[in-house]
Regions:
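Short glycine-rich phosphate-binding loop at a beta-alpha junction
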Residues: 1-6
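Short, ordered loop/turn segments at secondary-structure junctions
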Residues: 7, 30-32, 107, 129
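Short, well-ordered alpha-helical microsegments
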Residues: 9-13, 109-112
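Short Gly/Thr/Asp-enriched flexible loops that form oxyanion-binding sites at enzyme active sites
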Residues: 11-20, 88
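Short, glycine/charge-rich flexible loops or terminal/linker lids adjacent to PRPP-binding catalytic cores
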Residues: 21-71, 141-144
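DG-centered beta-turn motif at the end of beta-strands
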Residues: 75-77, 81
């Protein structure tokens, strides 16, 4: 079963699921529906939306689709690892341990520390790896040290 991570991991996950011949995927969400259980949510911090206080939700109706299945999590980018760590923690609340975390891009190396502490480092794979960039004083960019 493919689990897609909002926001851009959802279309990527849908494409992976379709390519694998799956008829559906499980989409995590950031907007709470009235039937969601707050116990199946986690705080979400992202470098693309800092300080916004989002939550990540797992629809309780999707738990039977995940129970006892091989699960792959799909996200667009893993950079600091905090978002994907929240995803893995959320799935653990539902009794789900993914066999792999797939990312379109692994950005920099900071994610390794976060996921290493959580014990998830060995499950991560990416299509490509790039450095993280920081802005120089002259307005240009350089790879983060």
């Amino acid at each position: 079963v493919i689990v897609g991570v909002p926001t851009l991991g959802l279309p990527l996950g849908e494409g992976v699921a379709r390519r694998l011949g799956h008829e559906r995927m499980v989409a995590l969400g950031t907007s709470r529906k009235f039937w969601y259980d707050e116990a199946l949510s986690r705080p979400l911090v992202s470098i693309t939306s800092p300080g916004q206080g989002k939550r990540l939700y797992l629809d309780p109706r999707m738990l039977p689709l995940l129970a006892g299945r091989r699960v792959a999590v799909v996200d667009d980018v893993i950079s600091t690892g905090t978002s994907i760590d929240a995803v893995l923690g959320l799935l653990a609340l539902g009794g789900v341990t993914p066999v792999v975390v797939l990312a379109g891009m692994l950005q920099g190396e900071r994610w390794r520390t976060t996921l290493s502490f959580a014990g998830h480092l060995d499950r991560v794979a990416g299509a490509l790896a790039t450095p993280r960039f920081t802005r120089r004083g002259d307005g240009g960019w350089e790879p983060e040290a």
